[in-house]
């Protein structure tokens, strides 16, 4: 049964959905809490659609993770991160390819993706988010994908830009 996955449908609701989905053997969840019998009987499919969309958004938990600024050099990146530290107290921390100022601002040491920089959006389940967004017609640049030691996807950029910014997903 090591390769078996389950889809529970009983006892699931908006408040416990994530706890079910956190278990690696659960592939999906369903249940009448999204498609209530009285709504079906009344033909209120717009309300069913709304509940289902809310469930998907709750599951994926999209949040702004950070904004990336493209600098032209290590010195410029360090100075930019230091400026945020002086302004707001966002502690500057140097990494391999960037500096972070707190958790909300990343300053790249050399220009990277995005004309103006990048925006990172975090999600509870990056693999599910990629599948969902691909179904909506969005594309990912898998050459940018980053994986952890267990080969789990941790980050990936979308193709293209939004408002001059590259956008990438990151696993919470």
Each model region followed by its residue ranges:
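N-terminal beta-strand motif that seeds the catalytic metal site of vicinal oxygen chelate
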Residues: 56-81, 114-121
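Hydrophobic faces of well-ordered beta-strands that scaffold small-molecule active sites
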Residues: 5-10, 27-31, 67, 119
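Catalytic cores of alpha/beta
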Residues: 1-2, 12-27
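Alpha-helix-loop-beta-strand connector modules within alpha/beta enzyme cores
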Residues: 1-3, 49-59
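Glycine-rich phosphate-binding active-site loops on the catalytic face of alpha/beta enzymes
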Residues: 25-48
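Well-formed, non-transmembrane alpha-helical positions, independent of function
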Residues: 19-20, 54, 132
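Vicinal oxygen chelate
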Residues: 49, 105-109, 134-172
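Core segments of cupin and vicinal oxygen chelate
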Residues: 68-106, 128-135, 146-157
């Amino acid at each position: 049964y090591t390769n078996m996955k389950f889809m529970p449908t009983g006892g699931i609701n908006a408040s416990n959905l994530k706890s079910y989905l956190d278990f690696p053997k659960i592939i999906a969840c369903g249940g009448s809490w999204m498609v209530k019998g009285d709504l079906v009987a009344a033909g209120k499919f717009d309300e069913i659609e709304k509940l289902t969309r809310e469930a998907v958004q709750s599951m994926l938990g999209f949040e702004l993770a950070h904004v990336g600024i493209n600098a032209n050099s290590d010195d410029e990146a360090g100075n930019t991160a230091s400026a945020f530290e002086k302004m707001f107290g966002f502690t500057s921390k140097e990494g391999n390819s960037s500096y972070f100022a707190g958790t909300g601002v990343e300053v790249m040491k050399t220009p990277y993706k995005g004309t103006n920089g990048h925006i990172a959006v975090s999600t509870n389940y990056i693999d599910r988010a990629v599948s969902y967004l691909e179904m909506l017609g969005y594309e990912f640049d898998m050459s940018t994908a980053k994986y952890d030691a267990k080969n789990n996807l941790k980050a990936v950029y979308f193709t293209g830009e939004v408002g001059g910014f590259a956008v990438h997903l990151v696993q919470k």
